[in-house]
Amino acid sequence: MIATPLWNLHVPSRLKSWFDTVTVAGKTFRYTETGSEGLINNKKLLHIQANGGVFHGQDPASQYIKTIFGFLGIKDCSELFVEGMDHDPENSESIVAAGIEKAKELGKTF
């Protein structure tokens, strides 16, 4: 599970640094004659992201996370976007409450 805010359309620098640390040839992926192959198989990813705006999963950060984990071999990815708190601050509490309910539902199958 990865839970992150959206900062300036990307992941926080500490998370980027962690990705750089764990993306290691021979450990988490390998090179083959036909290209790279992820070595982390049979794992799931749940990506939870808080956004001030509304992007519907099309922001660069969520695409980056999905791409990195796919490269490492994790194909079973679920996403939960709790978004719009800055766009609609009057409804931020209900946006967060709805996100918590969605997280509870996702947690039943994760």
Residue ranges and their predicted role:
Residues 57-110:
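Glycine-rich phosphate/pyrophosphate-binding loop and the adjoining helix
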